Amino acid sequence: MSPLTRTVAIKKTVKVLSKCQSGREYTQKFLQRAYSTSHANSTYYSRTKLFISSHSKALNIALLSGSLLLTYSYYSPKKILSLDTINGIKDYSTNTSGNINMPSPNPKGTETQKSQRSQNDQSVLILNDSKIEAKLHDREESHFVNRGTGIFRYDVAQLPSNHPIEDDHVEQIITIPIESEDGKSIEKDLYFFGIFDGHGGPFTSEKLSKDLVRYVAYQLGQVYDQNKTVFHSDPNQLIDSAISKGFLKLDNDLVIESFRKLFQDPNNTNIANTLPAISGSCALLSLYNSTNSILKVAVTGDSRALICGLDNEGNWTVKSLSTDQTGDNLDEVRRIRKEHPGEPNVIRNGRILGSLQPSRAFGDYRYKIKEVDGKPLSDLPEVAKLYFRREPRDFKTPPYVTAEPVITSAKIGENTKFMVMGSDGLFELLTNEEIASLVIRWMDKNMNLAPVKAEPGKLPKVIDVSEDKEAQRPAFRYKDNNSSSPSGSNPEYLIEDKNVATHLIRNALSAGGRKEYVSALVSIPSPMSRRYRDDLTVTVAFFGDSGTPSIVSNATSIVMNPEATTKPKPRL
């Protein structure tokens, strides 16, 4: 370890420490990139007067080595966390074994080091604990369902990275009249859960949260009018077709119809109505039919849905009911190349036309149309093209992107315990097994669950039985498989939340139970935060007809769970 007198902090750190010494109040922690270098004859310390009392109670500096942390510096109760803690992992990714590749020291100060220094020479105030908790809980909600129709609770949580958040979600129950065996009419439920991961703005995802269930329900109603027993049968093409039609009809209205109206009258209202066509969004919609206990998952894009339960031997298993639809999915690559023969650049660097990562999405007009009714979009008046975006390179034979979903079905039995839906930001941070294990641990503490078989401080073993695991992008952010710390001092999870979706988000940010990671990643403001994490949206639904507390008295009620819900604050 270098002597303290040979450690030089960069100028921004000096300025912040100077402010701290001035007596002004600041938040508890400060995130800053710092560098250590040989500086034997420097007059730096005496000139700044910062480190004269470096061994006093006012200021202590410590260098800690580890696979993830490069440096910690402590200034009285104020904390300085090196930005290398996060940047080293982000910038240097992981190797094939999953280990972290950290940059090697460069004492000569090469151009590469100088470039990295200039790019990362920025500071972020770390929020205090109460503000971090407020952010984590700001967008959480939980509901008890006492309808006796197969789902007894669902939790939702979000953590923005973009400002405003580009994700959205929907939870809705639609009742359908069913004729029972004795000829009586009874009501059964269709549960809809949706997550919409937007990009290029919040407009498309917001539109989907309001309209997608309505469009799908209308198409299902058309099928039901022709066949009253359609919801009794096992998975069938009629329901799948209705869901697909709802998706495609909404996307057609978003893109084609909005631009058609813009050609007819380029007024401000019609210009604004094209915003959901200009931005884009993935869509993940789950439909649980309480009549036959069939769960259908429709995915457009790269959000993911998991179901978890016990197999016949009592082992926990997790299964993905969706496959990530990106330019890295070989099935999607083959489909798109077949639709656009003779276009070698249709998939470039794992992206559609070298730009868009999801291969299916709502909106994203610039990957779908050049003209409407034979009229080129370039013919619109300039004022109508205010929000237009540049046409991609090699844009020859649109559409290159579709909103048509891929639909899968699963029978929900008594051993299927819960479903987790998440935007891709969650799966960048956690594996399918980790997500299922974290929910099981949460259930062990918060529900009447049989004791979980796992070592103290460890997550229970879960087997991933997904059919197409190779097509799913693995979790890659902040993964460190070299940790040798005992579970007691370095636990693999945190369990602090009453809302299980918030519990998943907290642990996704913790890099294996490290609270300092949660603090850092929650504190980084937008837009800088997008370098380190995406918007996070999570929904967890619990299957079964038990587990609802006595707070629910009405036999058909849906009741807010107050201890796991943060009521929205009035916005001026």
UniProtKB/Swiss-Prot annotation:
Subcellular location(s) of the protein: Mitochondrion intermembrane space
Matches recorded under PROSITE patterns: PPM_1, PPM_2
GO molecular function: [pyruvate dehydrogenase (acetyl-transferring)]-phosphatase activity; metal ion binding; protein serine/threonine phosphatase activity
Domain PPM-type phosphatase: 153-543
Gene3D superfamilies: PPM-type phosphatase domain (3.60.40.10)
Superkingdom as given in the UniProt entry: Eukaryota
Region feature Disordered, mapped onto this chain: 95-122, 470-492
Biased composition (Low complexity): 481-491
UniProt cofactor(s): Mg(2+); Mn(2+)
Record GO cellular component, one term: mitochondrion
Top EC class for this record: hydrolase
Record: residues binding Mn(2+) 1: 197-198
EC numbers on record: 3.1.3.43
Family the UniProt entry places it in: Belongs to the PP2C family.
Function: Catalyzes the dephosphorylation and concomitant reactivation of the E1 alpha subunit (PDA1) of the pyruvate dehydrogenase complex.
Protein name: [Pyruvate dehydrogenase [acetyl-transferring]]-phosphatase 1, mitochondrial
